[in-house]
């Protein structure tokens, strides 16, 4: 990242079991690929928190594994999961949105 760069570069490795986010050549997020949605389809929990809810959901909450066999099975859930995991990336100077590299 250049001195006057207006973006933060992060890399996202979407995996069926875990999703990893790398920032500044360090793994900053390594979470299970799970998402929990409320009855309106809004994000309730992501990663480890959503995995702990799996199989124990409240009637208004459902857990989803958006990737199956290395392929995105639920695009909406995958997008919500990625957005939730990106929010976990801590940065003191988060003035600009990240530039993503998905592998």
What are these regions (language model features)?
Residues 1-5:
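A short acidic-Thr-Gly-centered motif at the start of a beta-strand
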Residues 7-13:
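Short glycine-aspartate micro-motif
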Residues 16-103:
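Conserved phosphate-binding loops in N-terminal lobes of ATP-dependent enzymes
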């Amino acid at each position: 990242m250049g001195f006057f760069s207006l973006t933060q570069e992060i890399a996202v490795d979407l995996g069926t079991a875990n999703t990893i986010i790398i920032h500044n050549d360090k793994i900053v997020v390594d979470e299970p690929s799970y998402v929990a949605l409320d009855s309106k389809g809004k994000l309730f929990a992501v990663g480890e928190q959503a995995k702990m809810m799996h199989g124990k959901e409240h009637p208004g909450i459902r857990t989803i594994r958006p990737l199956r066999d290395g392929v995105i099975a639920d695009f909406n859930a995958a997008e919500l999961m990625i957005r939730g995991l990106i929010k976990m990336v801590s940065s003191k100077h988060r003035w600009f949105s990240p530039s993503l590299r998905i592998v």
